[in-house]
């Protein structure tokens, strides 16, 4: 299955990534090869093979629900470059909402 350069540009825009023209071409080629390889799995005969959902034999491993003392706030804030109202201030990663 061929992944077009336009599809790469569209997904990049949704992801707020920017690629050069050569990178876009390279991604389209590489992604097309990956999809082709995955599509080969459709040709594997799995008749009689039991469905496998996980390889782990353990289920619902939980720790005891014990309250623990948190980190001292003064110690935590020693290396914080910016703080506001007792919170760590970080750069905004979301814009006004847009249509992305």
Curated annotation (Swiss-Prot):
Sorted UniProt keywords: ATP-binding, Ligase, Nucleotide-binding, Protein biosynthesis
Record carries keyword Protein biosynthesis: yes
First-level EC class: ligase
Classification via SUPFAM superfamilies: Glu-tRNAGln amidotransferase C subunit
Pfam families: GatC
Catalytic reaction(s) noted: L-glutamyl-tRNA(Gln) + L-glutamine + ATP + H2O = L-glutaminyl-tRNA(Gln) + L-glutamate + ADP + phosphate + H(+); L-aspartyl-tRNA(Asn) + L-glutamine + ATP + H2O = L-asparaginyl-tRNA(Asn) + L-glutamate + ADP + phosphate + 2 H(+)
Biological process annotations from GO: glutaminyl-tRNAGln biosynthesis via transamidation; regulation of translational fidelity; translation
EC number assigned by the record: 6.3.5.-
InterPro entries the record matches: Asp/Glu-ADT_sf_sub_c, GatC
UniProt-recorded Gene Ontology molecular function terms: asparaginyl-tRNA synthase (glutamine-hydrolyzing) activity; ATP binding; glutaminyl-tRNA synthase (glutamine-hydrolyzing) activity
Similarity remark: Belongs to the GatC family.
UniProt subunit comment: Heterotrimer of A, B and C subunits.
Protein purpose: Allows the formation of correctly charged Asn-tRNA(Asn) or Gln-tRNA(Gln) through the transamidation of misacylated Asp-tRNA(Asn) or Glu-tRNA(Gln) in organisms which lack either or both of asparaginyl-tRNA or glutaminyl-tRNA synthetases. The reaction takes place in the presence of glutamine and ATP through an activated phospho-Asp-tRNA(Asn) or phospho-Glu-tRNA(Gln).
Name the record gives this protein: Aspartyl/glutamyl-tRNA(Asn/Gln) amidotransferase subunit C
Lineage, highest ranks first: Bacteria, Bacillati, Bacillota, Bacilli, Lactobacillales
